[in-house]
Amino acid sequence: ILQFAFEDDNSSYLPYNQPYNCICYSGTHDNDTSTGWYDHAPEHIRDKVRRYMNTDGSQISWDFIRTCFGSPARIAIVPVQDLLCQGSEYRMNVPGVADGNWAYRIKDGLLTSDIAKRLRDITRLYGR
C-alpha cells in the first residue's frame, strides 16, 4: 500500500523494495483516498512524497497512480476515487466506524473519455 511507504526511509512499501510477485495499491477501501491522505499528512511526509514522485503535488492522485503502475509489482490496483482525484469525503470505509461506510457511488458522467485516455496512456506506458 503506497500510502504506507513514506513513514520511514527503508519502508518495504516503497516501490523499489517491492518484489515482482506482489500487488501495489495506491490505497484500499480501508484507507483514505490518495488526495485525502496527502492533504492530511504532516508536511515532512508530503515533502518526502513530492521528492520521491518528483512532483509539485498538484495532481497527487495521478502521481500515486503513476508510481504504482511504474513499480516492479506484478499487479497495480488503484481505487476509482484516485482516478477521479477525489478527497476524503469520498472515502469508502473507516474501520471501526459503524455508520456511513460503503455508501460511495460513482455518479454518471464522472468517468470521462479524458480520464479513460489518461488511464490507457499510463497503462501502456508501464506495460500494465
What are these regions (language model features)?
Residues 1-128:
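Catalytic cores of glycan-processing enzymes that make or break glycosidic bonds
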